[in-house]
Swiss-Prot record:
It comes from Marchantia polymorpha (Common liverwort). GO terms for molecular function: heme binding. It comes from the Eukaryota. Required during biogenesis of c-type cytochromes (cytochrome c6 and cytochrome f) at the step of heme attachment. This is Cytochrome c biogenesis protein CcsA.
Length: 320
């Protein structure tokens, strides 16, 4: 079987597995919680990670260079990074709710690479002389791993903000619960006539318990967001430094203020501020989450926005 055919089979199969996993995790979050299906989702994520790993190894073997030379390969590597982070976090935290964030991230990134990019961009190409360097693996790998970890940490921070916005709103919680058809029937026919009693002392205790559980969830999200970003920041630092050394070898200058370099520096500064507020100022919860949420958009601008729309040494020139 030709390598290109095997690559396509692995790419499309892994995408559908990630789509299936995303459906399971979100289905479990919204309404369905069947243990065998949850286990099937966990197994499917492991298989998807294995398939993407195999895809990257085959691409590496057939092209003769590490598969990070174009947007398609880097997007596939980013998707693989999301699946790896998912498996690590799920194993460390023993919580399946993290898959609500990581599974869609892997699926959407994979879908962008597999379904959106033109066929000519998905083909393996020979490296230009400037990229034929041992720094390719070091620099680009560190940058892509930092992107995936920082994006996951930022998504956890965004989740904190969403939960915080509803933390003190008890009635919307009740309303959202009764949005399901069967529960809505119970509410309208059995509970609504007792509207005055619905806010009784016991009900208020239930709401207090809900807010306590939300407070616990916010603390756990805040902890994992901090830990993941703390991992991504040194990876980003190593990626920028190795890129500077590589740039000096290739172009004779450590820093050229290329759009990619500029936005990488902005990304570094945003997450440096985040870590400063956590480690030095002792901030927790909403305030650092706002900074990390800003970092989420900055990372995407740095990775895709500059590459696709900007002009410079790192531009893929697809949209312009």
């Amino acid at each position: 079987m030709p390598f290109i055919t095997l690559e396509r089979i692995l790419a499309h199969t892994s995408f559908f597995l990630l789509f299936f996993v995303t459906f399971i995790y979100w289905g479990k979050f919204l309404y369905i919680n069947i243990k065998p299906i949850t286990i099937l989702g966990e197994i499917s994520m492991k298989i998807a990670c294995f398939f993407i790993t195999t895809f990257l190894l085959i691409r590496w073997s057939s092209s003769g260079h590490f598969p990070l030379s174009n947007l398609y390969e880097s997007s596939m590597f980013l998707s693989w990074s999301f699946t790896l982070i998912h498996l690590i976090l799920e194993n460390k935290s023993k919580n399946t709710w993290l898959g609500i964030i990581t599974a869609p991230s892997a699926m959407l990134t994979h879908g962008f690479a597999t379904l959106s990019l033109p066929k000519e961009m998905q083909e393996s190409v020979f490296l230009v002389p400037a990229l034929q360097s041992h720094w390719l693996m070091m620099h680009v790998t560190m940058m892509m791993l930092s992107y995936s970890t920082l994006l996951c940490g930022s998504l956890l921070a965004i989740t904190i903000l969403i939960i915080t916005l509803t933390k003190q709103k008890n009635l919307p919680i009740l309303t959202s619960y009764f949005n399901f058809p069967f529960n809505s029937f119970i509410f309208k026919n059995l509970l609504q006539p007792m509207e005055n009693e619905i806010l009784s002392y016991k009900t208020q205790k239930v709401f207090s318990f809900i807010n306590f559980r939300k407070w616990q969830l916010i603390k756990e999200l805040d902890n994992w967001s901090y830990r993941v970003i703390s991992l991504g920041f040194p990876l980003l630092t190593i990626g920028i430094l190795s890129g500077a050394v590589w740039a000096n070898e290739a172009w004779g200058s450590y820093w050229n203020w290329d759009p990619k370099e500029t936005w990488a520096l902005i990304t570094w500064l945003i997450f440096a501020i985040y870590l400063h507020t956590r480690m030095i100022k002792g901030w927790q919860g909403k305030k650092p989450a706002i900074i990390a949420s800003l970092g989420f958009f900055i990372v995407w601008i740095c990775y895709l926005g500059v590459n696709l729309l900007g002009k410079g040494l790192h531009s893929y020139g697809w949209l312009i």
